């Protein structure tokens, strides 16, 4: 690994030497120090400047203005993007301002602000106006791109806002924020220094560039350009280091999302009264009447495509039925047809989000998964392993009613038997309803009441 790092630095050094050579050749071809100076002449000018107090005052004066403008723009953009995501009216109110910021040239803003405020805070304002719309729009787009299925899962399992943000919204935001910050960091330095050249405030790089232009001091101009590049690169490295730490951080989930007391020993009854659901003019099911009692699993015994998944969604509140009602139960947990796991995180972390205890999550998952799979990102697990993780999450959540939609998909005979034994062991006095095309084995079927509902899937 150290060898690869060394090769990487050598490669970068060679690339730097190449561009210095191009610069040197260009200066020799032009042969006019008023137009292009050599790298050595620029270095001499930089060393001369570095010995002056004014140089450091100008460098740090510009640095704090540009950093302040960037931070103000970024923080406000992140906050207002979150508000706009939550409240549509906020997005509509801000839309004209975003169009205005994107369409009006920076030079126009610079002249107007110079007239209104003077030059001292011009660079701060210009950096703000460049950074704000870019980060706002990308953040809002990232929030909107969050996986709808994962958000439904979070709603069912009652995940806290903190957990939803870090493990659902944050991965969705990552590509958008990285792109927005990379573009904004470069633009804020270019626009900030340009604003200083226009306003020429005291102790600023822009003011020094303006003086170098007046006195035709090209070497000093190149020296200040090198300073801008160094400051810009260093600032970008610091910001992206902080961003990388933020995206790598996996905060612990310290409290159960759904307190275990909800699954009491008292046997509850789920009442389904004259339930009906349709899409457009077609009834998926209609006139479904049933009571489900705790302590004994039920299996939906209906043909494929008859609406079992939609029925589950109506039971747990993800779909609103056209007719009837569901009552008697406050909390549901669901194993969806899709696994709906946070793919960037391990099986242990996915269960920890619900249980609030990483050690307990590891202990439980070890019953159905091999040890080496527990800490792998879920995207690297096989389909059968993911299915078992989603099964454990549904069974351990502590809900009064557990809905399992195709829990045995992707499982071989041995793992299916383990899953059936686990379901039977964990069912307790809760209501447990399964929808599966794979008939449960003997271990589970001894306690299964097969259910055929008249007209289920054939409503009119």
Segment roles from a protein language model:
Residues 377-381, 385:
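Conserved ABC ATPase signature
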Residues 344-360:
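Q-loop/switch helix immediately C-terminal to the Walker
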């Amino acid at each position: 690994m150290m060898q690869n790092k060394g090769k990487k630095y050598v490669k970068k050094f060679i690339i730097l030497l190449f561009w210095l050579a191009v610069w040197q050749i260009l200066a020799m071809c032009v042969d006019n120090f008023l137009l292009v100076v050599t790298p050595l002449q620029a270095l001499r000018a930089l060393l001369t400047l570095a010995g002056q107090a004014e140089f450091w005052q100008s460098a740090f004066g510009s640095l704090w203005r540009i950093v302040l403008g960037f931070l103000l723009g970024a923080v406000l953009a992140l906050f207002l993007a979150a508000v706009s995501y939550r409240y549509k009216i906020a997005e509509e109110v801000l839309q004209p301002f975003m169009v205005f910021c994107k369409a009006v040239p920076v030079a126009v803003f610079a002249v107007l602000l110079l007239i209104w405020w003077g030059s001292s805070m011009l660079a701060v304002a210009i950096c703000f106006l460049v950074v704000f719309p870019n980060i706002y729009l990308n953040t809002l787009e990232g929030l909107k791109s969050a996986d709808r299925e994962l958000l439904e899962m979070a709603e069912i399992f009652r995940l806290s806002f903190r957990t939803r943000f870090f493990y659902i919204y944050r991965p969705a935001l990552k590509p958008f924020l990285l792109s927005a910050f990379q573009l904004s960091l470069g633009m804020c330095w270019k626009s900030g220094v340009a604003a200083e050249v226009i306003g020429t405030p005291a102790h600023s790089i822009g003011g020094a560039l303006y003086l170098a232009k007046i006195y035709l001091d090209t070497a000093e101009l190149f020296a200040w350009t090198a300073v801008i590049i160094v400051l810009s690169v260093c600032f970008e490295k610091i910001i992206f280091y902080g961003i990388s730490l933020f995206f790598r951080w996996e905060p612990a989930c310290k409290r159960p999302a759904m307190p275990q007391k909800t699954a009491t020993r008292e046997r509850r009854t789920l009442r389904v009264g004259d339930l009906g659901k349709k899409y457009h003019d077609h009834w998926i099911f209609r006139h479904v009447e049933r009571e489900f009692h705790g302590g004994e699993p039920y299996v939906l015994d209906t043909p494929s495509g008859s609406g079992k998944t939609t029925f589950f969604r109506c039971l747990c509140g993800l779909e609103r039925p056209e007719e009837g009602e569901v009552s008697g139960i406050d909390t549901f947990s669901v194993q969806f047809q899709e696994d709906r796991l946070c793919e960037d995180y391990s099986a242990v972390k996915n269960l920890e989000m619900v249980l609030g205890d990483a050690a307990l999550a590891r202990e439980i998952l070890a019953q159905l998964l091999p040890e080496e799979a527990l800490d792998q990102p879920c995207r690297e697990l096989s389909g059968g392993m993911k299915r078992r993780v989603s099964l454990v999450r549904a069974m351990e959540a502590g809900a009064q009613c557990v809905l399992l939609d195709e829990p045995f998909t992707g499982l071989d005979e041995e793992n299916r038997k383990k899953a059936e034994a686990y379901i039977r062991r964990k069912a307790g006095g809760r209501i447990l309803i399964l929808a599966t095309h794979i008939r449960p084995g003997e271990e589970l079927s001894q306690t299964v009441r097969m259910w055929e509902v008249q007209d289920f899937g054939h409503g009119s």
